[in-house]
Amino acid sequence: GLAVFHAKLKRVYETAIPLVESRVTTKGDQLQFIIPQSQLFEDGRDVLRDTRKELFSDVSQTLIKRSGVVPTDMEILINAGSELPTEDGIKDHLAIRRVHALVEAFLGQGTPARNIYVGIKPGKEKKVYFKFYIRNSYDNQFSKVGDQ
């Protein structure tokens, strides 16, 4: 069940990054990991550290297996610095490039795009938040324009 899924994810993250911070909501339905960006990326770049490949592979396998039983999603939230990027500066913004690299790493390991959600928030902490939660159904979360 859910407790086994959470325990497996905790083992995966804590094995890859021993000082990772984890939190479970009071209802026990969501699990969140908080990781310094420096543990995932090369300094000042959007290049993922080679030592993290197994983390992405193991998380992807765990999420895929769980989603086959219960629709489960992963949200990736990254701090963007003191201000969010402007429309003109999006493609050059480091936080945007980093969240893109994370998504590509998970997609490359087979995680379905429908199970990944991303967000960017202002903040100087330079952390990445990974949240895992159950979706209410297997239905698509969004519809194409015109499908309304």
Q: Model-predicted segments: where are they?
A:
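A generic short-segment signal for beta-strand/edge and adjacent turn/coil regions
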Residues: 1-5, 41-46, 86, 99-104
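Short secondary-structure junctions
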Residues: 11-20, 66-70, 109-113
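Periplasmic OmpA/Pal-like peptidoglycan-binding modules at the C-termini of bacterial envelope proteins
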Residues: 92-148
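Generic alpha-helical secondary structure
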Residues: 2, 6, 49-56, 91-99
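Short, non-transmembrane amphipathic alpha-helical segments
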Residues: 49-66, 100-107
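Short, surface-exposed beta-strand segments enriched in small/polar/acidic residues
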Residues: 34-46, 62-95, 116-130
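Extended Gly/Ser/Thr-rich low-complexity repeat segments
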Residues: 44-54, 144-148
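Extracytoplasmic juxtamembrane/flexible linker immediately downstream
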Residues: 1-30, 34, 143-148
